[in-house]
């Protein structure tokens, strides 16, 4: 759902750059005031997990593929502001290091992928009573929140490219929302599964201001959590089919003559993406580990 450069008007791209930038600054101030230092490693680990998990594309209808977004999950675990800030870090890193989405369109991508999923998913989760639920009810509410947030995100994306003239608005809305009704099922299932698992093994992580401590066992589990998506990539591979937005933009009149979905999603681009993503996740892990060791050293008398 990452919009490349050249498909949004300057007015829409610029407006969303301002909105997303202001929201990031506000969220950063809120997180600094509201959270203790113990949340920083949790945010880092979850960012690395979402970054890695988003590389796992699975085939869906019509020769397209989809992947986990994770905004609702992060908002539920960290709160909407910290979840949005963590998701924004992932999307900005993808744009800067992997060329996944354009730089001019970065504000639009942060708005669609981060703001819409985090805030709408969290609002749905809380309004349905997810914060005080457990078991099957927690799983059901998590599924609904994850599924619905992806529909809102895809609708916003379609509206932006449709109003910009990249694709007819009616076609864009029906295609994006229709495909993401299917992708949202996977999003909802993964959101529900992770919430149910954490509710059983680490219920303190389900509370933003919970007393839980991020200890050695959590670090080991976090490494495993981040390694799992890469292990699946190596052993089973990931679908190289274009995602719904790439499929849609491949027939846009704004695309240069002769270009198509294969050019937007070539195997060379895929391997280059995989290598740089692996390097980036390793750097994230080393940075978090260095911060953790530094905190332990400074806490010693």
Residues of each region from the PLM?
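Hydrophobic transmembrane alpha-helices
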Residues: 2-10, 14-73
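Individual transmembrane alpha-helix segments
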Residues: 4, 263-286, 290
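Hydrophobic core segments of alpha-helical transmembrane domains in multi-pass membrane transport
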Residues: 17-29, 49-54, 119-122, 146-157, ...
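Membrane-interface capping segments at transmembrane-helix boundaries
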Residues: 29-34, 201-205, 288-301
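Glycine-rich ThDP/TPP pyrophosphate-binding loop and its adjacent helix/strand module
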Residues: 141-214, 218
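Juxtamembrane non-transmembrane "cap" segments at the membrane-aqueous interface
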Residues: 155, 238-264
């Amino acid at each position: 759902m990452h919009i490349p450069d050249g498909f949004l008007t300057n007015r829409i791209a610029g407006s969303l750059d301002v909105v997303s930038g202001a929201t990031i600054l506000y969220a950063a101030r809120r997180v600094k005031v509201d959270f203790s230092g113990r949340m920083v490693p949790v945010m880092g680990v979850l960012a690395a997990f979402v970054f890695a998990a988003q590389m796992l594309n699975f085939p869906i209808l019509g020769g397209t593929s989809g992947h986990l977004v994770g905004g609702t999950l992060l908002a539920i675990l960290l709160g909407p502001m910290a979840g949005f800030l963590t998701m924004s870090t992932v999307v900005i890193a993808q744009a800067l290091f992997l060329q996944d989405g354009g730089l001019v369109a970065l504000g639009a991508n942060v708005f669609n992928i981060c703001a819409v999923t985090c805030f709408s998913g969290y609002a749905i989760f809380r309004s349905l009573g997810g914060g005080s639920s457990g078991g099957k009810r927690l799983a059901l509410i998590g599924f609904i929140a994850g599924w619905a947030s992806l529909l809102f995100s895809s609708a916003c994306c379609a509206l932006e490219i449709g109003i910009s003239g990249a694709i007819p608005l009616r076609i864009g809305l029906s295609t994006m929302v229709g495909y993401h009704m299917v992708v949202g099922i996977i999003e909802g299932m993964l959101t529900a599964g992770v919430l149910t698992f954490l509710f059983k093994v680490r219920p303190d992580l389900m509370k933003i201001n919970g007393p839980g401590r991020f200890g050695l066992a959590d670090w080991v589990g976090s490494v495993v959590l981040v390694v799992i998506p890469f292990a699946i990539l190596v052993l089973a591979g990931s679908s190289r089919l274009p995602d719904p937005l790439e499929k849609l933009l491949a027939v846009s009149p704004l695309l240069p003559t002769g270009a198509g979905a294969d050019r937007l999603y070539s195997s060379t681009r895929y391997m280059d993406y995989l290598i740089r993503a692996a390097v980036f996740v390793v750097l994230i892990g080393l940075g978090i580990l260095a911060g953790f060791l530094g905190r332990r050293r400074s806490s010693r008398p």
